[in-house]
C-alpha cells in the first residue's frame, strides 16, 4: 500500500499500488528508420523468388504428399500471404477430389492443412490407422514425422472429433519418448512442438523458429524458398521496427512513465501483441492503431486494478460513458491525463479513417471501450468491498474485462476491407469471439492467480470456482484448463466453411487466442513480467535480423 495526494484533495489517500517493474527496453526502439537502399535491394530480389515459388505451387503431376509438404513449408516459412489464392484453390481441389492415401504422415498433414483452411474433412481419414479396438496401431510409433503431423493435427479438433483426443494422447506419449534420441533438426522440431503446437502459436514467432532452427538445417531444404523467406522476414522486420519507432515516440510524448508511474510501461510488449494479430504489410495502419489501443487500455486497467479509489473510479467510469471532454473537470489530476489522451486518440482515429470515408466506424470501438470500463468498475467494487461472486456472475463480468471484445473490434478499424456488416456481426459476440475471450480469461486467471491472491484479491476466477464447487486450487485450475480446451474446439468449428464473414476477419480472432497461449505459457504472466517469456520473442522479431 502507498499514500499519495491526488489533484486538489488535501487528505491523504491510501492506494493499493502495485510494484510493476520498469520497461526492459528504454529508448531502444525510438529512433529506427528504414534503410531504403537495403529495403529496395531485398524487394527486388524477392520478385523473381516469388515467381519461382508460384511456379512450384502451380506445377502439375506432383504426388499429393509433395504438394502438401510444399504448402506446409511455404506457410511455416511465413511467405504464404503472397499465395493465398493459389493455396486455397489447390486445397479446394484436394478436398473436393476426396484425395486420399494410405500414408500415415501424409494423411495427418492433409487433415491439418484442410481444417486450418476451413475445409471440414472427416476425421475418419485416421480410422485406417487404428486396430480392431479403435486404438492407433503401435507400429506407427516408429514413424516420428507421422507422429509429429498427427500431434499437430490433433490441435485443430472440434467437438465431433473424438478420434483426435486419442490422437493427441497417442502422439504425445510417443513423441516424448522419441525426442531425446532424434537427430537434429527433427529433435528440435519435436521438442518445440511439444511445448508449443503450431496451431496455437503466434505465426511470426513460429516462422522465425522454423527458418533459423529447423529449415536451414534440413538436408532436403529448397534454397529458393529459404532465401525468399529470409529476405521477406528481414524486409517485414524493417517495417515492423519503423512502426514500433513511431509508436514509441507517441508513447514517449504522452510521458505516462512520469505522470502515471503506477502503471505498467509495456508499449513494446503491446506492439508484440498487435504483431501477433497481423504481421502482413497491408495491415500496417491497423497494427499501429491496435497497439496504441492496447497501450491505452493497459493504463486504464492499472488505474482500476492498482491505484484508483472507489469515488475516483466511479467518476472516471461515468466520464468514459459520457465521452465528453467537458467531463474532465470532475476528475482528479492524474485521471485527467489518461482521459484526455483516450479522447484525443479516438479523434485521431476518426481523422485517419476520414480519407476512406470510414470515420463513422470508430463508434464501434468506443462503445466497446465504454463496456470494458463499466465492467472494470464492477470488478474494482468487488475488490474493495471484499465480495466474492458465484463463478457464473464472476465470468459474466470478467469476460468483458479481458478487453478481447474491445480489441477484436479495434483490430477491424484499420482494415480496408472491413464493412459495417462485419462490425454488426462482431457486436453480437459470435461463438468464435466468445471462445477467444474465454481462452484469454481462463489462461490469464490461472497465470495470475498467486499474484492476485497475494494482493488480497479474493474475487478471482480460481477462488470463485474453488468456493462454488468445493474443490482444491489444483482442481479449479484443471477445470479452467478444460474450459480453454472446449473454447479451442469452438474456435476450430468457427473456422469451418461456410463462414459468416471472411477468413481474414476470423483469423484475427484466432490470433488473439494464440497470443494469450504464448504470453501466459507455463502459467507465467509474460505481459507483466516479460523477461522470461516475451523478451526472447521480441528480440527475435524486432531486434535481430536473420543472417542471409
Swiss-Prot record:
Monomer. Binds 3 Mg(2+) ions per subunit. It is an enzyme of class 4 (lyase). Its cofactor is Mg(2+). It catalyses: (2E,6E)-farnesyl diphosphate = (+)-5-epi-aristolochene + diphosphate. Keywords: Cytoplasm, Lyase, Magnesium, Metal-binding, Plant defense. It is found in: Cytoplasm. Expressed in roots, but not in shoots. It comes from the Eukaryota. Belongs to the terpene synthase family. Mg(2+) 3 binds at residues 444, 448, 452. InterPro entries: Isoprenoid_synthase_dom_sf (IPR008949), Terpene_cyclase_plant_C1 (IPR044814), Terpene_synth_N (IPR001906), Terpene_synth_N_sf (IPR036965), Terpene_synthase-like (IPR050148), Terpene_synthase_metal-bd (IPR005630), Terpenoid_cyclase/PrenylTrfase (IPR008930). Pathway: Secondary metabolite biosynthesis; terpenoid biosynthesis. GO terms for molecular function: 5-epi-aristolochene synthase activity; magnesium ion binding; terpene synthase activity. GO terms for cellular component: cytoplasm. Mg(2+) 2 binds at residues 301, 305. A motif (DDXXD motif) lies at residues 301-305. Catalyzes the cyclization of trans,trans-farnesyl diphosphate (FPP) to the bicyclic intermediate 5-epi-aristolochene, initial step in the conversion of FPP to the sesquiterpenoid antifungal phytoalexin capsidiol. Produces germacrene A as an enzyme-bound intermediate that is not released by the enzyme, but is further cyclized to produce the bicyclic 5-epi-aristolochene. Mg(2+) 1 binds at residues 301, 305. Disulfide bonds: none annotated. This is 5-epi-aristolochene synthase 1. The Asp-Asp-Xaa-Xaa-Asp/Glu (DDXXD/E) motif is important for the catalytic activity, presumably through binding to Mg(2+). One of its GO terms (biological process) is defense response. Its EC number is 4.2.3.61.
Amino acid at each position: 500500500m502507498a499514500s499519495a495526494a491526488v489533484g486538489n484533495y488535501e487528505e491523504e489517500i491510501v492506494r493499493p499500488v502495485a510494484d510493476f517493474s520498469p520497461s526492459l527496453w528504454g529508448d531502444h526502439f525510438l529512433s529506427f528508420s528504414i534503410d531504403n537502399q537495403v529495403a529496395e535491394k531485398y524487394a527486388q530480389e524477392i520478385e523473381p523468388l516469388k515467381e519461382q515459388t508460384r511456379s512450384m505451387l502451380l506445377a502439375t503431376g506432383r504426388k499429393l504428399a509433395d504438394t502438401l509438404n510444399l504448402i506446409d513449408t511455404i506457410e511455416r516459412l511465413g511467405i504464404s500471404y503472397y499465395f493465398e489464392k493459389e493455396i486455397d484453390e489447390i486445397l479446394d481441389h484436394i478436398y473436393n477430389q476426396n484425395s486420399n492415401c494410405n500414408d500415415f504422415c501424409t494423411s495427418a498433414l492433409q487433415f491439418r492443412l484442410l481444417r486450418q483452411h476451413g475445409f471440414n474433412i472427416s476425421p475418419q481419414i485416421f480410422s485406417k490407422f487404428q486396430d480392431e479396438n479403435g486404438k492407433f496401431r503401435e507400429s506407427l510409433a516408429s514413424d516420428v514425422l507421422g507422429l509429429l503431423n498427427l500431434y499437430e493435427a490433433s490441435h485443430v479438433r472440434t467437438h465431433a472429433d473424438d478420434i483426435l483426443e486419442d490422437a493427441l494422447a497417442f502422439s504425445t506419449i510417443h513423441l516424448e519418448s522419441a525426442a531425446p534420441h532424434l537427430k537434429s533438426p527433427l529433435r528440435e522440431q519435436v521438442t518445440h512442438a511439444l511445448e508449443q503446437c503450431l496451431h496455437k502459436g503466434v505465426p511470426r514467432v513460429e516462422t522465425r523458429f522454423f527458418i533459423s532452427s529447423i529449415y536451414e538445417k534440413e538436408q532436403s531444404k529448397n534454397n529458393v524458398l529459404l532465401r525468399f523467406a529470409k529476405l521477406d522476414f528481414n524486409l517485414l522486420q524493417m517495417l515492423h521496427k519503423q512502426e514500433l519507432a513511431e509508436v514509441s515516440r507517441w508513447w514517449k510524448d504522452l510521458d505516462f512513465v512520469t505522470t502515471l508511474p503506477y502503471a505498467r510501461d509495456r508499449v513494446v510488449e503491446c506492439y508484440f501483441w498487435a504483431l501477433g494479430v497481423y504481421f502482413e504489410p497491408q495491415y500496417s495502419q491497423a497494427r499501429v492503431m491496435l497497439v496504441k489501443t492496447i497501450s491505452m487500455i493497459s493504463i486504464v486497467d492499472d488505474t482500476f486494478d492498482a491505484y484508483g479509489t472507489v469515488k475516483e473510479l466511479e467518476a472516471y467510469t461515468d466520464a468514459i460513458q459520457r465521452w465528453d471532454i467537458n467531463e474532465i473537470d470532475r476528475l482528479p489530476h492524474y485521471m485527467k491525463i489518461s482521459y484526455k489522451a483516450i479522447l484525443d486518440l479516438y479523434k485521431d482515429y476518426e481523422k485517419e479513417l476520414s480519407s476512406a470515408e470510414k470515420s463513422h466506424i470508430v463508434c464501434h470501438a468506443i462503445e466497446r471501450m465504454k463496456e470494458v470500463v463499466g465492467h472494470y468498475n464492477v470488478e474494482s467494487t468487488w475488490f474493495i468491498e471484499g465480495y466474492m461472486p458465484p463463478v457464473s456472475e464472476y465470468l459474466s463480468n470478467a469476460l468483458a474485462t479481458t478487453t478481447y471484445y474491445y480489441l477484436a473490434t479495434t483490430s477491424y478499424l484499420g482494415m480496408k476491407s472491413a464493412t459495417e456488416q462485419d462490425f454488426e456481426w462482431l457486436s453480437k459476440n459470435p461463438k468464435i469471439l466468445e471462445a477467444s475471450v474465454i481462452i484469454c480469461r481462463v489462461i490469464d486467471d490461472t497465470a495470475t492467480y498467486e499474484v492476485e491472491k497475494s494482493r488480497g484479491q479474493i474475487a478471482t476466477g480460481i477462488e470463485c470456482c474453488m468456493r462454488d464447487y468445493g474443490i482444491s486450487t489444483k482442481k479449479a485450475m484443471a477445470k479452467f484448463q478444460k474450459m480453454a480446451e472446449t473454447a479451442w474446439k469452438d474456435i476450430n468449428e468457427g473456422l469451418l466453411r461456410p463462414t459468416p464473414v471472411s477468413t481474414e476477419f476470423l483469423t484475427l480472432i484466432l490470433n488473439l487466442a494464440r497470443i494469450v497461449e504464448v504470453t501466459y505459457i507455463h502459467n507465467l504472466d509474460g505481459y507483466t513480467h516479460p523477461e522470461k517469456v516475451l523478451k526472447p520473442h521480441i528480440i527475435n522479431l524486432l531486434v535481430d535480423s536473420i543472417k542471409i
